[in-house]
Design a protein with these regions (language model features):
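Short, Lys/Arg-enriched N-terminal segments with co-localized hydrophobic residues
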Residues: 1-9
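Bacterial N-terminal signal peptides that target proteins for export
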Residues: 8-17
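Ligand-binding clefts/hinges and TM-proximal coupling segments of bilobed small-molecule sensing domains
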Residues: 66, 144-162, 251-295
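Short helices/loops that flank or line small-molecule/ion binding pockets
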Residues: 76-90, 103, 121-122, 138, ...
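A ligand-binding cleft/hinge motif common to bilobed small-molecule-binding domains
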Residues: 91-104, 159-165, 191-194, 198-219
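Bacterial N-terminal signal peptides
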Residues: 17-25
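Bilobed "Venus flytrap"/periplasmic-binding protein-like clamshell domains
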Residues: 33-34, 38-60, 72, 95, ...
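Periplasmic-binding protein-like
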Residues: 36-41, 110, 115-125, 215-253, ...
Length: 295
């Protein structure tokens, strides 16, 4: 009887071990098979894929998730992709993130810090050619202004806010000879360099990136105005992703710099820091104020 009980116990233990082995293998297979789509809007004419590739590869290696990138051409498309469930993770500008948080269940979780900088914030610059007759910010009245794209934070929203401070508006025909959207920060700057615009409003990140890759030389231009600090363009994920997976993705992004060279929105990054939704309340107030002033 004792031998019979021992055999039964051994059989039970073997079956239990087998069950746990199967469950463990199944759990691992599930984790490895999880796939997420990441959407981004190129910040420049350079394409930007290389800025994201290294970071994504490291995140994939750490989490064992598969991340597929989707490039779209405008900010609204990036929001719509997450709202419709076609994208799970996104690189957004600050203003676009506010919209995505409102209608697409987006949640900001990280932002890149550029090499040599102390935080992830950046600025909107107003740039003119070196020999321009525009000497101070108020001199832009009556001139040709180029901006990035409608919906851009540092290439549309913040320039409008800064102009409002000196009682100018892009929608008032008396304030500018013309205002046009060039389609990217790079194109906005090139419009000035090629005499298509007198002044451009653009991201400080793209200004520095194009200076670094010799698209232009510092002596060709002047910065006539710099905005207050702008909250950084965040990486955001959909709240529809299970919490445990969101935590894995966030932790991997925050640790990524330890595993190799990484990039992000606007070029090379030294590392990523944690951000939260309330960090963008200042932009929400700016958007509300601008709407109020226009109404």
């Amino acid at each position: 009887a004792n031998n019979s009980n021992k055999e039964m116990n051994m059989t039970y233990l073997k079956n239990l071990v087998l069950l746990f082995t199967i469950l463990f293998a199944f759990t691992n297979a599930q984790a490895e098979s999880k796939k997420f789509n990441m959407v981004f809007v190129p910040a420049s004419e350079k394409g930007d894929e290389s800025d994201y590739t290294a970071l994504i590869k490291i995140v994939e290696d750490i989490t064992k998730f598969k991340i597929n990138t989707i490039k779209v051409t405008d900010y609204n498309a990036a929001v719509e992709a997450m709202r419709a469930g076609r994208a799970d993770i996104a690189w957004y500008g600050g203003k676009t993130y506010i919209k995505a948080a409102e209608i697409a269940d987006a949640e900001a979780f990280a932002a890149g810090v550029r090499p040599g900088e102390k935080d992830a914030g950046y600025y909107a610059y107003f740039v003119v050619k070196k020999d321009s007759k525009i000497k101070k910010f108020s001199d832009v009245k009556g001139k040709v202004l180029s901006l990035n794209s409608i919906g851009s934070t540092s290439g549309d929203l913040i320039p409008q806010v800064e102009l409002a401070k000196i009682n100018l508006s892009t929608t008032n025909e008396d304030d500018f000879k013309s205002v046009f959207y060039a389609g990217s920060h790079d194109a906005c700057l090139l419009a000035v360099l090629n005499n298509k615009a007198d002044v451009c409003g653009m991201s400080s990140r793209n200004y520095e990136a194009r200076l670094a890759d010799n698209t232009f030389k510092k002596e060709q231009v002047r910065i006539i105005h710099k905005s207050d600090r702008v909250p950084p363009p965040p990486l955001a994920y959909s709240k529809r992703i299970p919490l445990e997976d969101r935590i894995k993705i966030k932790n991997a992004v925050l640790e990524a710099h330890k595993y190799g060279k990484i990039g992000g929105y606007g070029g090379e990054m030294s590392h990523y820091i944690s951000v939260k939704d309330s960090d963008y309340d200042v932009l929400r107030k700016v958007v509300a104020l601008l709407k109020k002033n226009k109404s």
